[in-house]
């Protein structure tokens, strides 16, 4: 009998332990607005400058596929950059033709205009590096901008970038802040010559890379933002930086401090966005990810890996991208464009060759036509969560204050209201399931819950997310189990 009692006692202890093994995480969403008028989340979507050089333009069928995917995703903010030798500048003759190769960029900008998407447009570099201070480039570039905005009516273009990452040693500016600043004012003066252009389009900058310092430059990235605010705020409509953190520094909660370094220099009344955002694994803490990256690059048929994220195929990338967005949104930034939408946009150095393609996207729409890899055209896992972060935090969302009571830093959350509706996104990057008790600032009517788990990603026939639960009503609290390494989004936006 004693033996039986001992067995029963052990079983009872095991059951109690099992029932209480999940840590309770209390999340409180208050009605306090911490970041008003969010511009939105989106992606880098460049107009397939190299496609024809690779041997295939984007077909009508592929455009239909792209539009269908984007119509579900509802990006609120697109960064669209061109290489002028593939557009208005003929390198062989040195001549300007604004109608040259206009079809694909027109199609892209028409899509954004018709759907009210904010576009940050610009040029990666001048037509040739020797032209970086040439008035001819300024004249051509601004005339082309005016052609797109005023002549063709692409009113989606709200911001204009004159150099991509001018602080970089890979840029034609090579970190020369003074030269960049002078060119910024020259571009602005030229824009003012076109009636109404500066009322429709404002300059964005400095477009520098966070956590980077070019030895040839007088300033690190923070210094660039600070000096831009001091020297050129009168002509800057939107501040932007690029961010490529490591997984470990974001998952361990270090990134808000890094983001704040740039935000604190932005003058009151102005906004700042991430013009590009992705992950790179060169830091020591991410060495295992880097080893896997290198393994995948070795012998790859169409990339050497010089500018890629070979892990964008993986489930975990669908946790890391919304996690970064949560830090951005809670950190007072106004938007984030992921790098990038589609592998079919760039090769390293924009060489026009397919031997070293930049693989960062949610798919490669030219997988079959150019690379003889039809599977590359399929949607990758991270589209699941990123599309939800775009769709359910529309332009104009007010980001709310959230508090997470937890023993560790495994659970992250962001919440926002839009026209009286609420969206709450949560991610658990830890190794244990969490019992979440969510306190809401208002009731939710006809709410939906989306779940992204490694073995549970409900989708429709097109591969788009569908909610795990629908039609429920919440008075002010909600309880759920947020499993280890998973994402959930709760919304009553229809």
Segments (PLM) and residue ranges:
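Mature N-terminal, pre-catalytic/accessory segment of carbohydrate-active enzymes
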Residues: 19-64
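Carbohydrate-binding surface patches
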Residues: 406-445, 452-454, 485-489
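C-terminal beta-strand-rich structural cap/linker in extracellular carbohydrate-active enzymes
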Residues: 465-494
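Substrate-binding cleft and catalytic face of glycoside hydrolase catalytic domains
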Residues: 70-248
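C-terminal accessory region downstream of the catalytic core in glycan-modifying enzymes
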Residues: 438-472
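Bacterial Sec-dependent N-terminal signal peptides
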Residues: 1-23
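Noncatalytic carbohydrate-binding groove/subsite architecture in carbohydrate-active enzymes
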Residues: 177-327, 331
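Aromatic/acidic polysaccharide-binding cleft in carbohydrate-active enzymes
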Residues: 279-393, 397-412
